Amino acid sequence: VTTFSILDVEIQEIEGAKTLFGDSLTTFPMAMVILDPYTLESSWILDTADRILSHFQGADVRVALVVAGSDPEGAASFLGPLPDRILTFVDRERKLVKELAVKSLPSFAVVRQDGSVLGVAEGWDPAEWRELADNLAEMTSWSRPEVPASDDPAAYQGTPARGSVSQVIPTDAELVEKVIIRFAGDSGDGMQLTGDRFTNASALAGNDLATLPEFPAEIRAPAGTLAGVSAFQVQISDHDITTPGDAPAVLVAMNPAALKSDLGLLVNGGTVIVNEDTFEERNLEKAGYSHNPLEEGSELDGYRVIKVPMTELTKEVCKDLGVKPRDADRSKNFFALGLVSWMYSRPVEPTLDWIDEKFQGKDLVIAANRAAFQAGHAFGETAELGDQRVAIKAAPLPSGTYTSITGNTALSWGLIAASHLSTRPLFLGTYPITPASDILHELVRHKRHGVMTFQAEDEIAAIGSALGAAYGGYLGVTTTSGPGVALKSETLGLAVSLELPLIVVDVQRGGPSTGLPTKTEASDLLLAMYGRHGEAPLPIVSASTPSDCFDVAIEAARIALTHRTPVILLTDGYLANSSEPWLLPDPSTLPQIHVEFATEFNQTNEDGDGVFWPYMRDENLARDWALPGTPDLMHRIGGIEKEDGTGNISYDPENHGYMVDLRQERVQKVKVPDLEVDGSQDYELLVVGWGSTWGAIKGAVGRACKDGYKVGHVHLRHLNPFPNNLGELLSKAKKVIVPEMNLGQLSKIIRAEYLVDAKSVTKVKGVPFTAAELDLVLRETLDD
């Protein structure tokens, strides 16, 4: 039993009154579930917390919910009706969390009357929660609750309990505005993990950031080869940024192949940190070197080179821990992370806490990773690296709670939000395909939020199941990438004919065929627009940033449900895997999506009897949606052309022409907000973008405008139909350019639709545009 000084911690009641925690104990111990209202991890456990705490009401124990990091109003909004039946406190400044030494939320804690702690279960570990609940039941002579219950979520680790980490600026560090770092090594060297943890520490320190993960398509390419290089680039800044940077200032190269493949990306005069232990003859040959560039040759001329024996130093610090040399070798990425964390004054606590949580139960792994990280940090302190230590202040971001989020995760959460906003349960029918699979991995965790997931045997079965779910009243979704869209095209045409709400998420990648599974591209626009036989129009929306995927998912659902139509949502591999800070929205500000089902007859037959016609329409031309099993509303739908209104099969030429026009008009009735111009309002050059080009375009336009160029920028979220004012904005420009990660697909559509001489700027290399590339294009276009 450990005693904490928690009796004098000030907390708030849900009504707003302040009190001391000790006063709330009275003569009984306190059983608490502590929650963070700004994380899904805490929301997942609400029903479980309600069940466990309610079970102990009536026993000789007080039960309470504690909401950390929020005010009473926010806590009440998060908890809904729970405070009406369970005592609720607010730990706004997380002082109680700190005194309890809680590292992750949600947590289940029991505190005795004297302030001593019976136990704390952190995260959602059903076994730990059950053990603590059993101990409480034994102490109070009460029955034991069911933990876990059948509808409880699967185990998960929770989120950091302390919120953001205060960044300490070392006195010996030079303040800089931003830095771009690239970690590169074998696909088995843990570069994605290393970059992710550096990103996480930077997010907690309050920096703005943008990332670019790059990895090979092979599960494990031959070690030491150029084909097997995995890289992670991150830009961190003390101000708003929109891209992972033009060129890294620091390259961490874990082997010769990483140096060979990525050195050309580094800025002139940049810093190269190499694991010199890997620069031996065999690895040099695999990378295509005829010599050791660390000892001879001119490849590294003009760069600051820091040679570190990472492998040997890692093995040395792990030797006394009982870790085998081969196992210690796996921790060398943490040595690199520790060194770079020292160089850029990153807080160390988030990484050490994460190691403890991630590898819980694997004591040797924890010990090795912690030792390697701390050794790397110590190496930076003692190696006399001169002026290499810098610091970046926190960015002045709008107030609120932030999380670092990837596009696939944001899209998943947006679909869940849309499900709740529309009161329609979410069904995902999908077949795994890179880079869309993470959406399935995320949604499968959210059963308690009304999410149903189905992994089909192929792409056609996946979309068929989603369309069937839509027929049954669900928000039907299927996810895929380019090859999968081609396979789904016939069923997508069926969805157009059936006029049912369906969302098809296309996370684009390099093509054609298998193409570049792990590299980004945006070459499916024409496929989305026209890739079905017959006249089969449908709305198309696209996301511009990782966090924008959340909003676009809700918008796709709004269009699909309101207009009874399939919708294609376009993202790409860059958005899917890159991350940025995201200000968590207030759920109460998200607009509801109103869905009405047909429940009664909507027509009268010639005998005066009520009948249901499935193709009767509202002002949006959306047909009536009757759920299967609704009394007296039995009806027939299918892929053969239907008569408008009755839904009867029709081969009449006039009816077919009418239905073709009607389906097109129905898409045009989608309400699309007007475009707003970024940059110069009296522009001579207008840049029209879509998708993930937003960040690079915004950065380039900002640079050009700063130097006096009259450049405007509009970015299309809605690609079909277009915003009403697009034509007007195009007509005001002397010149128009359209940057795309394809060979000019949007440019072709704009030229055909508006008869504008739109110049296409293309890049199809598997990597996104940089702001520097586009800045040069803007200046050349206006100077021409």
Language model: regions and residue ranges:
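Non-globular targeting/processing and membrane-anchoring segments
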Residues: 1-29, 44, 54, 58-67, ...
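Short, internal strand/loop/helix patches
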Residues: 79-105, 109, 556
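A short, hydrophobic beta-strand/beta-hairpin element that forms part of a small beta-sheet core
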Residues: 106-122
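Active-site cofactor/cluster-binding pocket
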Residues: 169-422
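Thiamine diphosphate
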Residues: 178-267, 413, 418, 426-427, ...
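Flexible, low-complexity linker and terminal segments
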Residues: 397, 404-414, 422, 552, ...
